[in-house]
Swiss-Prot record:
It comes from the Bacteria. GO terms for molecular function: gamma-glutamylaminecyclotransferase activity. The gene is ytfP. This is Gamma-glutamylcyclotransferase family protein YtfP. GO terms for cellular component: cytosol.
């Protein structure tokens, strides 16, 4: 199975250690989403923009660990999207974004620009 990551799970980011057993397939950008800063990590929500990230091949154990990390408390929900590498899971932020900083570039790696 595959997963699209756009924030702290990306290569050389704060939570990238969760992806140690994953195989990077390549970069990907998804349209019709916007990226917001939640502080130390981002949240993607449906919107008028593009979010940039990476697609990985993962196993069931890694997906279960990521679900425990991302879906606790209802902060994110996993959604199936289409990528050039095949269908992939994506964590979509579930809370209101009012008052949060929009990352105009859609790229967490460029959040400070």
């Amino acid at each position: 199975m595959r997963i699209f990551v756009y924030g702290s799970l990306r290569h050389k980011q704060g939570n990238s250690h969760w992806m140690t057993n994953a195989q990077l397939l390549g970069d990907f950008s998804i349209d019709n989403y916007q990226l917001y800063s939640l502080g130390h990590y981002p949240g993607a929500v449906p919107g008028n923009g593009t979010v940039h990230g990476e697609v990985y091949r993962i196993d069931n154990a890694t997906l279960a660990e990521l679900d425990a990390l991302r879906t606790r408390g209802g902060e994110y929900a996993r959604q199936l999207i289409q990528t050039p590498y095949g269908s992939a899971w994506m964590y979509v932020y579930q809370r209101p974004v009012d008052g949060l900083k929009l990352i105009e570039s859609g790229d967490w790696l460029d959040r400070d620009k």
